[in-house]
C-alpha cells in the first residue's frame, strides 16, 4: 500500500471553531501555570518496561526537587504495584506539605473505591476521573449514545462524593477529564462537564479541575486554543473551576497547543518531563517551562541542573533524550557552522553580567541550566575561524590576531577534511603547537643575548642550522628590529601582537608575528615563553621557518 494521491478520500480536516471574537491571539502568557507531572502514570504506562518501585520513588523525588507541586503518581486500581506505590509515598512520608499527590481512576465503583482506599491517610489528594466523550469512542469503543456517556460521568462523580466523605481527614480535590475532549463536540463536552460540576458543587475556595485533553492531537494548535477559549467562556461556575490542559504530540505541536491554550485562559498543565508518553508523547513540561523562562517569566520550576534531571529520566524510562531535544539535548547549545560560531564568539565577548541575554543563536544562557560553555562551539569541516578562535581563547587563553585566525582556520580545515571527524579543543591546540610552536627547521633558536644602550638594541642569537651552531648578530631600534637585521634572509615584519596568558607568577607571554620573507606571501608565527622578548623571538623564528618550508614545498 502507498500514500493516496487524494488523501481526502480517507482523511478529513478537523472542523474549525466558530469563534469570530476570539481574544487569545492578542494575549500573552505572563505567569507560570499550575504544573502537574504525569510521568509516573501516563508516562510510565507508555514504557516498554514500566518502572519498578525503586525507579518510581527516584523519579518522584526528582519531580519534588525541581518544584512540581502536583504529581500524578499512579493508577492505583490498575495493579497491586501501583496501589502499593501510593501507600509507600503516604506511609513513608515522601509527600511534602506543599505537594499534592494525584491518582487516576476509571468510572466504575469498584475501581473508585480501590482508588480512595489507596489514599487513606493522605493530607491532601487529587482524584482524577475520566471517561471518553468523542463520537468515535461513543460509537466504536463503548456503543453508547450521548446520554449514556453523560450518565457514566455523573454516576462516577456521585461516587467520588460518597467515598471522599468516608475519609474526611483528607483535603480532597476532584478532577474530571472528558477524554478525547479535542475530538468531542464542544456543546456536548460542556454539557457533561456542567453535569459533573453540579454533582461536585465546587466553590471559588475549593475548585474542581476540568482537564481538557488532546488525547490524540487531531488539529492545528489554534483550533485547540479556540476550544479552550470557548469552553472557558461557556462552562458554568467558571470562578470555581481550574481549566487544565493535557496535550499529546501526535502532530508535533504539543508545546504550541499548550502555549496557545494558556493564552486562551487555561490555568494548569499536565505533561511529562522531556515529552515521554503514549505514542509520540505528552507535552514536554521542561520545554514549556523554559520557554517561559526565556521570555523573562519565572516558571516556578528549577532546572538549574538539567543534565542531572535528564540522567534520572533516561535511566528510569530507559529511553534516551534526543540530541536535538530543546534545551537539554547534547547538541542544542552546539554550533559547528563557521558563521554561527563567529556570531556566538562575538556575542560572548560583548555579553556582560547583569545585562539582557543577547548572544546570537543561543536563546538561553547554558549556564542557567547547569550547562558549561565547552560544548557550545565544536569544530568540524563546516567550522570557521570563529569557533577555532573561541576554543583556543576559552581553553588555553590564546587570542589569535584576526589575520592569523584566517590562516590557522585553513590549517584546521585541512585536518578535519583529512580526518573526516570533529576536532576537540585539545586537538586544535596540538595542531597549533605542531604547525607554529614546533616550527624549528631550518633555523632553531637556542638562546639569545640582548644589550640595550641609548635607545638602541644589539642582539646575539645562538641558532642551530644544519647540525651546527651559528651566531647571528644585529642592531636596531628595538629587539625585533635588531634580530631582523642579523638574519641571513630579507624579512619584512607586517604585524605584531602580544598578550599575557594567565596571571601572577605562572603567567606567560604569547607573541604573534606576520612577516614576509624575500618578498614571498605573508605568513604567521607564534611564540610562547615566560619572557616577552623570548616569546617575540620565537614567534619570528616560527614565521621564518614556516615561510621557508612553504617556499621549499612550492618549489618541489
Swiss-Prot record:
Protein keywords: Amino-acid biosynthesis, Branched-chain amino acid biosynthesis, Cytoplasm, Leucine biosynthesis, Magnesium, Metal-binding, Transferase
Entry's EC annotation: 2.3.3.13
Pathway: Amino-acid biosynthesis; L-leucine biosynthesis; L-leucine from 3-methyl-2-oxobutanoate: step 1/4
Domain Pyruvate carboxyltransferase: 33-307
Primary location group: cytoplasm
Keyword Isomerase in record: no
SUPFAM superfamilies: 2-isopropylmalate synthase LeuA, allosteric (dimerisation) domain, Aldolase, post-HMGL domain-like
Record flagged with keyword Metal-binding: yes
Gene3D superfamilies xrefs: 3.30.160.270, Aldolase class I
GO molecular function, one term: magnesium ion binding
Compartments (UniProt record): Cytoplasm
GO cellular component, one term: cytoplasm
Annotated region (Regulatory domain), positions in chain: 439-556
Enzyme kind, highest EC tier: transferase
HAMAP family, alphabetized: LeuA_type2
Subunit composition and interactions: Homodimer.
Function recorded in the entry: Catalyzes the condensation of the acetyl group of acetyl-CoA with 3-methyl-2-oxobutanoate (2-ketoisovalerate) to form 3-carboxy-3-hydroxy-4-methylpentanoate (2-isopropylmalate).
Family note: Belongs to the alpha-IPM synthase/homocitrate synthase family. LeuA type 2 subfamily.
Protein name in the entry: 2-isopropylmalate synthase
Provenance organism: Pseudomonas savastanoi pv. phaseolicola (strain 1448A / Race 6)
Gene this chain is encoded by: leuA
Amino acid at each position: 500500500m502507498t500514500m493516496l494521491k487524494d488523501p481526502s478520500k480517507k482523511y478529513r480536516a478537523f472542523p474549525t471553531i466558530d469563534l469570530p471574537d476570539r481574544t487569545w491571539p492578542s494575549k500573552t502568557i505572563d505567569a507560570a501555570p499550575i504544573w502537574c507531572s504525569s510521568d509516573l502514570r501516563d508516562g510510565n504506562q507508555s514504557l516498554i518496561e514500566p518502572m519498578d518501585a525503586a525507579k518510581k520513588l527516584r523519579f518522584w523525588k526528582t519531580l519534588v526537587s525541581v518544584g512540581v507541586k502536583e504529581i500524578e503518581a499512579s493508577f492505583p486500581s490498575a495493579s497491586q504495584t501501583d496501589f502499593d506505590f501510593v501507600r509507600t509515598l503516604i506511609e513513608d512520608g515522601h509527600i511534602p506539605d506543599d505537594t499534592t499527590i494525584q491518582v487516576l481512576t476509571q468510572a466504575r465503583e469498584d475501581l473508585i473505591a480501590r482508588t480512595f482506599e489507596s489514599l487513606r491517610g493522605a493530607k491532601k489528594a487529587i482524584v482524577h476521573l475520566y471517561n471518553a466523550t468523542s463520537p468515535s469512542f461513543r460509537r466504536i469503543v463503548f456503543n453508547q449514545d450521548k446520554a449514556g456517556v453523560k450518565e457514566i460521568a455523573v454516576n462516577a462523580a456521585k461516587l467520588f462524593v460518597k467515598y471522599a466523605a468516608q475519609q474526611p481527614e483528607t483535603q480532597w480535590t476532584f478532577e474530571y477529564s472528558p477524554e478525547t475532549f479535542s475530538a468531542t463536540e464542544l456543546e456536548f463536552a460542556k454539557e457533561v462537564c456542567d453535569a459533573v460540576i453540579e454533582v461536585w458543587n465546587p466553590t471559588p475556595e475549593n475548585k474542581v479541575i476540568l482537564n481538557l485533553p488532546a488525547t490524540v492531537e487531531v488539529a492545528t494548535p489554534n483550533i485547540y486554543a479556540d476550544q479552550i477559549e470557548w469552553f472557558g467562556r461557556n462552562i458554568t461556575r467558571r470562578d470555581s473551576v481550574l481549566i487544565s490542559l493535557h496535550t499529546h504530540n501526535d502532530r508535533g505541536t504539543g508545546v504550541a497547543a499548550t502555549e496557545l491554550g494558556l493564552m486562551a485562559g487555561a490555568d494548569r498543565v499536565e505533561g511529562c518531563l522531556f515529552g515521554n508518553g503514549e505514542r509520540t508523547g505528552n507535552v514536554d513540561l521542561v520545554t514549556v517551562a523554559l520557554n517561559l523562562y526565556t521570555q523573562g517569566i519565572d516558571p516556578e520550576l528549577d532546572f538549574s541542573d538539567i543534565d542531572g534531571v535528564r540522567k534520572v529520566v533516561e535511566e528510569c524510562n530507559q529511553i534516551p533524550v534526543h540530541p536535538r531535544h530543546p534545551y537539554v539535548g547534547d547538541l542544542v547549545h552546539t554550533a559547528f557552522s563557521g558563521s554561527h560560531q563567529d556570531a556566538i564568539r562575538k556575542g560572548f565577548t560583548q555579553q556582560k553580567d547583569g545585562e539582557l541575554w543577547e548572544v546570537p543563536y543561543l536563546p538561553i544562557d547554558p549556564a542557567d541550566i547547569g550547562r558549561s560553555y565547552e560544548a557550545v562551539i565544536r569544530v568540524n569541516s563546516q567550522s570557521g575561524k570563529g569557533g577555532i578562535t573561541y576554543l583556543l581563547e576559552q581553553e588555553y587563553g590564546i587570542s589569535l590576531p584576526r589575520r592569523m585566525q584566517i590562516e590557522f582556520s585553513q590549517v584546521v580545515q585541512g585536518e578535519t577534511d583529512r580526518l573526516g571527524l570533529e576536532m576537540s579543543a585539545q586537538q586544535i591546540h596540538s595542531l597549533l603547537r605542531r604547525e607554529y610552536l614546533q616550527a624549528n627547521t631550518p633555523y632553531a633558536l637556542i638562546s639569545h643575548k640582548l644589550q640595550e644602550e641609548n635607545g638602541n638594541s644589539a642582539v646575539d642569537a645562538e641558532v642551530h642550522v644544519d647540525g651546527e651552531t651559528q651566531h647571528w648578530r644585529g642592531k636596531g631600534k628595538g629587539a625585533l628590529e635588531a634580530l631582523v637585521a642579523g638574519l641571513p634572509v630579507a624579512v619584512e615584519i607586517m604585524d605584531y601582537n602580544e598578550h599575557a596568558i594567565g596571571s601572577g607568577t605562572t603567567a606567560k607571554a604569547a607573541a604573534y608575528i606576520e612577516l614576509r620573507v624575500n618578498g614571498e606571501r605573508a605568513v604567521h608565527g607564534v611564540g610562547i615563553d615566560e619572557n616577552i622578548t623570548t616569546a617575540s623571538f620565537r614567534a619570528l623564528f616560527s614565521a621564518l621557518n614556516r615561510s621557508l618550508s612553504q617556499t621549499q614545498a612550492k618549489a618541489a
